Amino acid sequence: METKRRYKMYKVKKHWVTIAVASGLITLGTTTLGSSVSAETEQQTSDKVVTQKSEDDKAASESSQTDAPKTKQAQTEQTQAQSQANVADTSTSITKETPSQNITTQANSDDKTVTNTKSEEAQTSEERTKQAEEAQATASSQALTQAKAELTKQRQTAAQENKNPVDLAAIPNVKQIDGKYYYIGSDGQPKKNFALTVNNKVLYFDKNTGALTDTSQYQFKQGLTKLNNDYTPHNQIVNFENTSLETIDNYVTADSWYRPKDILKNGKTWTASSESDLRPLLMSWWPDKQTQIAYLNYMNQQGLGTGENYTADSSQESLNLAAQTVQVKIETKISQTQQTQWLRDIINSFVKTQPNWNSQTESDTSAGEKDHLQGGALLYSNSDKTAYANSDYRLLNRTPTSQTGKPKYFEDNSSGGYDFLLANDIDNSNPVVQAEQLNWLHYLMNYGSIVANDPEANFDGVRVDAVDNVNADLLQIASDYLKAHYGVDKSEKNAINHLSILEAWSDNDPQYNKDTKGAQLPIDNKLRLSLLYALTRPLEKDASNKNEIRSGLEPVITNSLNNRSAEGKNSERMANYIFIRAHDSEVQTVIAKIIKAQINPKTDGLTFTLDELKQAFKIYNEDMRQAKKKYTQSNIPTAYALMLSNKDSITRLYYGDMYSDDGQYMATKSPYYDAIDTLLKARIKYAAGGQDMKITYVEGDKSHMDWDYTGVLTSVRYGTGANEATDQGSEATKTQGMAVITSNNPSLKLNQNDKVIVNMGTAHKNQEYRPLLLTTKDGLTSYTSDAAAKSLYRKTNDKGELVFDASDIQGYLNPQVSGYLAVWVPVGASDNQDVRVAASNKANATGQVYESSSALDSQLIYEGFSNFQDFVTKDSDYTNKKIAQNVQLFKSWGVTSFEMAPQYVSSEDGSFLDSIIQNGYAFEDRYDLAMSKNNKYGSQQDMINAVKALHKSGIQVIADWVPDQIYNLPGKEVVTATRVNDYGEYRKDSEIKNTLYAANTKSNGKDYQAKYGGAFLSELAAKYPSIFNRTQISNGKKIDPSEKITAWKAKYFNGTNILGRGVGYVLKDNASDKYFELKGNQTYLPKQMTNKEASTGFVNDGNGMTFYSTSGYQAKNSFVQDAKGNWYYFDNNGHMVYGLQHLNGEVQYFLSNGVQLRESFLENADGSKNYFGHLGNRYSNGYYSFDNDSKWRYFDASGVMAVGLKTINGNTQYFDQDGYQVKGAWITGSDGKKRYFDDGSGNMAVNRFANDKNGDWYYLNSDGIALVGVQTINGKTYYFGQDGKQIKGKIITDNGKLKYFLANSGELARNIFATDSQNNWYYFGSDGVAVTGSQTIAGKKLYFASDGKQVKGSFVTYNGKVHYYHADSGELQVNRFEADKDGNWYYLDSNGEALTGSQRINGQRVFFTREGKQVKGDVAYDERGLLRYYDKNSGNMVYNKVVTLANGRRIGIDRWGIARYY
């Protein structure tokens, strides 16, 4: 058995005395659990006080386990959490004697002279060694003298301070494994980087292994190493001229090269440098030890190193010597190759490997829950360090919702958008920038005139890109320009001739556009979403994401800018445009999902290789051709049938719905092409007049339906001259109008009595109609002429109604339709019938540029491109060539406005989808429309030809105006930046905060921006002064044409996306927290670079621990990281701090060895927990994300982590034992009640339904508790079991009454049939209770037993009469014979009652007993008392015959059928 002993260490001044005592306790102070100590008795220890030799002292000073002394500074900064006793009790297992002195004394110089520690490779000089030994001996002598005198006092002090020792065995979660102690978490694994407070002592469990670690020992070697050597005078910078050091705005960067005073020619001879002799700064200097180690190991890989692997434990002097070896090899190779490009490549590659110089220190979220499309954004801020980039503006998120900075519209309760979308984010609140945006818009609209001297090549209208990501002032500026330049507010014709649209997703945008009398049309995004969810989403049973499931059809009528219900259709209308898919909507999101799910799970799906894209489209295109789709959208033709037939909206047709999104332009038709082509051409001929939409809820045959939704939507257009169904119209009305009939239920089955009545209007009574589209099991069939559908003609009745039943309408599932679609049109229209209406020459009285009208309805926009068209393989495949060749096709579809792809030459930086596929949205020079080279769509001339061809066919052309961002500018500027999310909010724990950062913000002054930037402002100011005189809303300023932007600079931007340069690419000395810059007499560089004396390392100056950087500067008011990755803070006196600290407005914690807790929990004595984040700041007053933003915790004002049920900001939430907020989950509380916490907010669900992972539904009341029993909610009745689960599709007994709750909604079933598990049928009446007895339902007479079961194939006696109900239908049988199971026959009369007595049926005289049984082969007395006999087979009365009865008696029957016994 191992012997347990306790080791006490007594502190005498600055020296420690170790004593062994048998013990089972530990108080953590300043010794390690594995300390090298002797297991002698206390008495022996006290008698053996010796002084270590100076050589041992030196070794101790260089040990990584150097004792951390208690300094005056540390004591004043202590808190309860880190107070230390001077006596340390250690519990450990001793298995062998360890050679050691019983008392170890360490000398520290009282003056501020420090000793430079030398590596074994370079021994200190004899003189320095002697001095050090003398100093150590003196200190040791003093300690020895004091030790005996103070030992007794120290023991007494230790006993007092050790009243609360730590018993590791008593801590429930602390377990000893292989001689080490670990804290075992709830998951059964050791917790790592975890601190625990026990009896006022802090136990720390290692961040790598989780083992309990002694925090009394420093993690670094003490001592200074001189940085100056024989190379230093030669490697110093030759002078401070700009040509001698590569900088950005005078700041030095990680890949900077400089001109040294001398070069080591051929690796042998120091030779004065020339102006061309530049060398990488990283050849002779490194910002810290860890970077130098990485450099040396990297150079080993390049064949330029020593071959030795260097680690954090390598001495500084050994690293310096190795760097000299590398320099020799570099210079040798330069002499051999006579060039340095190879070295630049190596250095550039090395820089990218270092965390401080790459995205590892940029809080990149690309792989998790992204807070920006490119993984992160940087906001520029004003600073004296970068005054040239300062701005008075950068007013963020001034969207239409919040143009003044405060929300004005609340249809959409969000902020309505955010500023940081992509790349260099333009500051559109800056008046100079606003003027430049106007200049560019004018250039774009007049491109043909300006560049080609050809007005026919000008654009007519504009699509404003990303409205919710730019300053809303731009919308007003653009509207002002369109009004001034084209007079779009002067007449409807002008407006339509220059049709412009907004990519505006927020529901607040249309109202803003109306209030500001905008010259562009908004999206009806409400209707778009309604169509998406009602038609294209999967059924709930097929959906992997239960938030993305198919809804009913009702929102298609009412959830729109223009309500089309009977009650809402005459309300105020708003002009708009509508689409179901677009180049960047419902396409790239699907492709991203496929890539992430099936090809490359490490990508976000928005950055990919072209090969990955090709693989994704193979899956995408195959899925589109499946009936049951996994990724792509269902019912695309149905969406077009509704959009194209709608009144009060312009449809935008999307290229990708007609052709495959990938492949060469127009090469491959989509599976929807024929149906949409038919609808487009039919719209020209038929879509006119008033409109009515409604939903008919058929009863349906639910026993054969997977989904019990029975709504069938009908949309009718009456034709010109008929605005209502009752209008007579004119002769022209007869051949106009159309009906769309649709269901979104692929399992829909009408019952035999269901009817769908479509009122085509009085103008169309007794008129023949034909199908335009019909759904079959294989897809949609198009009928493009009357003759093609002649056999299917159907006539309206005298009310003008078309009537459809189960033989016409049912659900289908095929690649084109998931549900049902039919379109009907009147017979007799001429081939050239065109119901479209010309625009008026009058202005709208309201002052609105666009108002809903027949002329506006007559327009059709074609978004004629896809993001994902392949790059051409031959010139003839260019998009713009194909457009010019196919204008007649577009015209036949009714296209009036062709929206072209953005024609800008694309950036090829590959940083985001747009620049990978080069779709034109990622540009570096926005004035370059295929001018410097071909864009993806063709040459400049191809574009001009396409525009002119469209114009020649009467089709206007819409250009894409993208005022939000500019990609990949060639010039860099150093800016002051902070890592933010897309709203410009600081990302907690990001290292980049008011940090100097090199961004790509400058254009080169030689591009088209230089030629055309600001070039037209003077002309525009003279022509349209009103634009320049308007005060803009967001900034209160007029646009400023005085400054022409011929070159972009940081001052014109809000910021950029993270660029992968890291927090430290712009170099600074972390110790002094000052950036290196070349600035004349204010130049600040590493000391050794100017041949000044410099040393580096940690050293105690007698008052505390200090640090000197690898640039030779002392750390003050700064954080420092050692080579092992530990962080420390040095105060304004340059001393290391300990314990709980308040620094820069944040609370932080430092262990007793100075190591800062980072990404670490500290569990307090009361069990509460604090967390110190990535920067060591204690989390408080908010929610914080963990695990790549996938989980959340909450910390209160004191930094305590929430656990259990908590009320935060008025919301009840639940946090598990690890502090993670529970979302989308059920929790059973200590009261046994179930509660659900929302999957989005995490708030406890109240007054709403929620479902569990098994698909069971519950209803949570106002207390968040699941209801049980029968409940009436929002006027509907439901039933919940005692476990809270909603009963669906089941029959239950409630207070003795049978009730049925629908399988889909769970509502109490009324007026409906339902079956139980035994296939017994029930009918539930208007009160929801199962009926009993005789019932007439839907005109059918049925019978239900007392238990509610429908009687089928049985006889029932009630009201004294026998009745029989059909075995299949259950209907009461009338006027027919039926037999019972014993073979007895009955005849049911016209009332369904069994006849009795003598009866004449079908010419036969028969007889039935009082029970209704027919008499056969026997006698009976009739109502006159006469005996009669009835044939045993037919039952007919017998005449003139002698018969022997079954009982053996004989009877004779006369000619009148009267029988007598013999």
From Swiss-Prot:
InterPro entries: Cell_wall/Cho-bd_repeat, Glucan-bd_rpt, Glyco_hydro70cat, Glyco_hydro_b, Glycoside_hydrolase_SF, KxYKxGKxW. Cell wall-binding repeats lie at residues 171-190, 192-211, 1095-1115, 1116-1136, 1137-1156, 1180-1201, 1202-1221, 1223-1244, 1246-1266, 1267-1286, 1310-1330, 1331-1350, 1352-1372, 1374-1394. Changing residue 1142 to Q: In strain: GS-5. Disulfide bonds: none annotated. Changing residue 68 to S: In strain: MT4239 and MT4245. GO terms for biological process: glucan biosynthetic process. Residues 109-133 have a biased composition (Basic and acidic residues). Its EC number is 2.4.1.5. It is found in: Secreted. Changing residue 135 to V: In strain: MT4245. It holds the Pfam family KxYKxGKxW_sig. Changing residue 288 to N: In strain: MT4239, MT4245 and MT4251. Its main location: secreted. It comes from the Bacteria. Changing residue 255 to N: In strain: MT8148. Changing residue 1290 to T: In strain: MT4245. PROSITE patterns: CW (PS51170). Changing residue 132 to S: In strain: GS-5 and MT4467. Residues 35-164 are annotated as: Disordered. Changing residue 1282 to P: In strain: MT4245. GO terms for cellular component: extracellular region. It catalyses: [(1->6)-alpha-D-glucosyl](n) + sucrose = [(1->6)-alpha-D-glucosyl](n+1) + D-fructose. Belongs to the glycosyl hydrolase 70 family. NCBIfam families: glucan_65_rpt, KxYKxGKxW. Production of extracellular glucans, that are thought to play a key role in the development of the dental plaque because of their ability to adhere to smooth surfaces and mediate the aggregation of bacterial cells and food debris. This is Glucosyltransferase-S. It comes from Streptococcus mutans serotype c (strain ATCC 700610 / UA159). The lineage of its organism: Bacteria, Bacillati, Bacillota, Bacilli, Lactobacillales. The gene is gtfD.
